[in-house]
Amino acid sequence: KVDHIAFTGGPETARHIVRNSAENLASTSLELGGKSPFIVFEDADIDSAVNAQVSGIFAATGQSCVAGSRLIISNKIKDAFLSKLAAKAAAVVIGAPDDIATEVGPLCTPAQRDTAVKLIAQSVAVGAVVVSGGAPLKRDGNFFPPTILDCSDAPDAPCLTHEFFGPVLSVLGFDSEEDALSLANDTAFGLASGVFTRDLSRAHRVIRKLRAGIVWVNTYRAVSPMAPFGGHGLSGHGREGGLQAALDYTKVKAVWLRTSDDPIPDPFVMR
């Protein structure tokens, strides 16, 4: 008998697992995908935010559930930010995983590469602009360059909603804090998020309103076994790490222990 199932993967497989777990009502912990927003306000440290964004989306070739795949940036600094980001993306060393100089390796499968090509083409067709990358490299293997798509004029572009599991960043600009939150929460996923600002009060307001299991402020991808890791919506439920993970693997038991030696009175005797 299986009492609990912990799964890391995609929503479709998770649905299959949940349906089958109903046979014996086993509990589940599901760590699924994400389409994580990376919000940069106009007062942010741009150089730090650029470096964090490069790591957030291009590390591990973007094959990460917490990849910061949606850059939501103040229109006041958007052009300057994208200029720096595109330069960093173009300078990334792409190569074989066993080469110590490699910074971005290949995608795991040809299917991932083909999906990226398809989604980028569909996004460009509705108005997205390729800022950097955009097409697989002409070499053996599933190599795909760091890609940046400006979707400011393409709010319905599929690259904004589909998880690539690859090094593809979609960009949207905003004019107000409310706009930023609306764009950030416009997703069926709810795993991770990043917020870059020097305004601590703003950071706390945004933290409260973001629908995400993880919020990183002025950093990205910080992890610890002491911190709960997980999300909600299409990102699943349950947690890895922290006290919450331990609770997911335990059963609650209420115990009442009477210590008095006095006899229990007859409840039906009139007093």
Regions found by a protein language model. Give the residues of each.
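ALDH superfamily catalytic-core signature
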Residues: H4, G10-A154, V217, I264-D266, ...
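Conserved SAM-binding loop
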Residues: A6-F7, V195
